[in-house]
Amino acid sequence: RPAVIFGHTDLVDADEKYIGPRRLSPPEHLSWKSFKHGMLVCHQAFFAHKDLFRTTAYDMKYRFSADFDWCIRILKKGDAKKMGTHHAQCIISDYLNEGMTTQNHKKSLLERFRIMWRHYGGFSTIGHHLWFFVRKP
């Protein structure tokens, strides 16, 4: 029984017209450590096992990146229970290209930095953010 079933996400515009696949793709094997590399799986394409879902609420102190923190915490709990993950190998969701996080990009990045610091520590977080800066198109 997997802790999480996850898949791919396509981007759409406000009229629900297809734009293309998301720039970040989910890895074949997803773990809480995978999120060091960014939000690799949209929460819309991330289905937590019901036992984990029921006991893991969004942390509402995060206005724009609560999903990022939630996914990491779900995966950590699944890891502690020796539950794996399952890549569905298909497109599970469409995602609005200009959503709330995009409209509040700087605030979202600051929240995400704080979340990563909490879960991965300072050295790793700073190193990965330097990589995010380099990889950005």
Give the residues covered by each predicted segment.
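A short coil-to-beta-strand element that immediately follows conserved catalytic motifs
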Residues: 4-5, 86-88, 124-128
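Membrane-proximal basic amphipathic "stem/tether" segments
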Residues: 110-113, 117-137
